[in-house]
């Protein structure tokens, strides 16, 4: 409502100036009745001082022609102004030559409803930078108990800098600041405007005004988060009404410094209540790229880079990313003020080790993370995979070597071990990653099919200290392990309280202290021990 009041105040200020100008002109007309038309070019300095220099500080403005005419047939005073607007800093960026015409009915009768009408239209010029399609018109109508203002218009091929330059400083300060800070270059290819204000005779709004502004845009560079590379080559639509503002991004891309690209398939910006100070805002991004490029992008952000420690060269797989940011609409927004959701889906994932050899292959992986400062100062979420095949992972091989000799040959080119599915609940902060109840289930419950193996793991990895501390259970021969679980009452005693525990299970610990090498320990008392006794020896 505050923004709307400013708009109306600005509108009424302009109307009052028009009427003041009209009264002055009528007096001028009465003094010189012998003329049918008057040249008012001498008013040019007054108009520039009282309007242009106050409200359009980034624009050069010149009046080429001012004329006043009284039409006896229609009883109208007709003001005609030919003027030129140019970008003050760089006139080659845009020019607008317009003809404005204001018709004031000076002899209203009971049948006459229109108090005044106006039109603003572009004049075609040879200059390449000149805007050639700009047309607005409106009227003030007197009804029985109310007055109604109607304003309509359309425009094509407006440079974004034109919108910035002609945006009054005191009108919609927050939106204006965000536009100046976040949007650059590009074209408003098509714009349609329609509005209606119904006022009481005392000038107060009778009810909520109707405002609809629809536009198409292309090639606008958009900075969505501080420090991140912008979206470019954009194509989309926008809508503004009395309550909300939204932008739909149809296409775009993010160019990374190594020459790779992230393709934006769909995006949205929503300001759900523009009347509310610091009202709710939302950004949605739907993108596709190589998973390594996504991590490369996230590493550009000052805060997120502290959480994302994976090198893009370690990851490969075509992926789809969905990002959601909810935040207050104000001039400066801290990351801690946002609610963030990350949904990353990867197909045919490959993870490489430091020797550039394929270490892990997966049919698919899904990462879901949420960040809410009101709940905690870290990301919470889960990682899910399907058909993960471990080819070469030294730490895992050492666990198997200590626990189950004969299965550890995955570290030297032997048979791989495949897990059918996995699920990890995780917390991610700038200190490290915490895994809760990580479960890797076997591909087959038949021990004769491949290396059938289950595993559970929990623990934490500290980024800066490079310290790890994980505990887990290796459960071989899942088919045999699951037999007791089918026995009523006794099933839980023998199979354990968690997925991944069973009649036969080997407890292990992976840890490091003071930056030393990683150590692996197993609990020999947990081997061939029922699940409820395994928990005793933890």
Identify the residue ranges that each predicted region occupies:
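Membrane-embedded beta-strand positions of outer-membrane beta-barrel proteins
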Residues: 151-153, 215, 249, 285-287, ...
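Amphipathic hydrophobic-ligand
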Residues: 47, 57-64, 92-105, 123-138, ...
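Generic short beta-strand segments
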Residues: 81-88, 121-123, 194-198, 216-223, ...
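Extended terminal
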Residues: 2-35, 200-202, 298-302, 310, ...
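Long hydrophobic segments that form regular secondary structure
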Residues: 204-208, 213-222, 320-334, 340-342, ...
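Secondary-structure transition motifs
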Residues: 2-9, 49, 53-54, 60, ...
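Terminal hydrophobic membrane-targeting helix
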Residues: 30-115
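Flexible, solvent-exposed coil segments and beta strand-coil junctions
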Residues: 84-85, 112-116, 167-177, 214-220, ...
């Amino acid at each position: 409502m505050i923004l709307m009041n400013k708009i109306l105040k600005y509108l009424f200020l302009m109307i009052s100036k028009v009427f003041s100008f009209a009264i002055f002109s009528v007096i001028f007309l009465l003094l010189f009745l012998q003329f049918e038309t008057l040249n008012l070019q001498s008013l040019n300095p007054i108009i520039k001082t009282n309007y242009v220099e106050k409200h359009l500080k980034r624009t050069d403005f010149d009046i080429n022609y001012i004329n006043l005419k009284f039409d006896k047939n229609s009883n109208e005073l007709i003001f005609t102004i030919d003027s030129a607007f140019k970008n003050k800093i760089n006139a080659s960026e845009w020019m607008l030559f317009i003809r404005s015409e204001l018709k004031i009915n000076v002899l209203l009768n009971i049948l006459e409803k229109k108090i005044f009408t106006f039109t603003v239209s572009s004049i075609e010029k040879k200059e390449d930078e000149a805007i050639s399609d700009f047309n607005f018109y409106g009227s003030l109508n007197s009804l029985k108990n109310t007055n109604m203002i109607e304003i309509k218009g359309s425009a094509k091929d407006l440079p974004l800098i034109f919108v910035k330059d002609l945006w009054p400083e005191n009108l919609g300060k927050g939106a204006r600041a965000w536009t100046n800070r976040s949007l650059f270059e590009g074209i408003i290819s098509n714009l349609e405007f329609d509005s209606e204000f119904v006022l009481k005779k005392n000038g107060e709004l009778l009810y909520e005004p109707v405002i609809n502004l629809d536009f198409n845009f292309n090639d606008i560079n958009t900075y969505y988060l501080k420090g991140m590379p912008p979206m470019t080559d954009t194509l989309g639509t926008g809508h503004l009404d009395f309550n909300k503002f939204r932008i739909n991004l149809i296409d775009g891309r993010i160019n990374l410094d190594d020459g790779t690209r992230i393709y934006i398939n769909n995006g949205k910006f929503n300001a759900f209540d523009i009347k509310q100070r610091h009202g709710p805002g939302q950004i949605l991004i739907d993108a596709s790229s190589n998973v390594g490029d996504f991590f490369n992008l996230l590493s550009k952000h000052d805060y997120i880079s502290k959480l994302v420690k994976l090198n893009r060269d370690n990851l490969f797989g075509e992926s789809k990313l969905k990002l959601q940011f909810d935040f207050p609409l104000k001039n400066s927004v801290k990351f801690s003020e946002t609610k963030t959701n990350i949904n990353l889906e990867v197909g045919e994932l490959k993870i490489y080790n430091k020797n550039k050899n394929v270490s892990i292959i997966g049919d698919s992986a899904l990462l879901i993370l949420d960040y809410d400062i009101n709940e905690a100062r870290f990301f919470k979420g889960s990682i899910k995979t399907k058909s993960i095949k471990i080819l070469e992972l030294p730490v895992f091989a050492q666990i198997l070597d200590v626990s189950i000799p004969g299965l550890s040959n995955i570290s030297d080119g032997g048979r791989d071990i495949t897990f059918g599915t996995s699920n990890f609940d995780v917390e991610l902060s700038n200190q490290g990653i915490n895994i809760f109840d990580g479960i890797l289930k076997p591909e087959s419950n038949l021990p004769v099919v491949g290396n059938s193996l289950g595993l559970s793991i929990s623990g934490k990895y500290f980024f800066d200290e490079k310290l790890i501390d994980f505990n887990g259970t290796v459960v071989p021969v899942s088919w045999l392990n699951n037999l007791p679980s089918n026995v009523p009452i006794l099933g839980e005693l023998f199979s354990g309280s968690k997925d991944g525990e069973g009649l036969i299970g080997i407890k292990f610990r992976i840890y490091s202290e003071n930056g030393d090498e990683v150590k692996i320990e197993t609990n020999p008392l947990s081997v061939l021990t029922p699940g409820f006794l395994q928990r005793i020896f933890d």
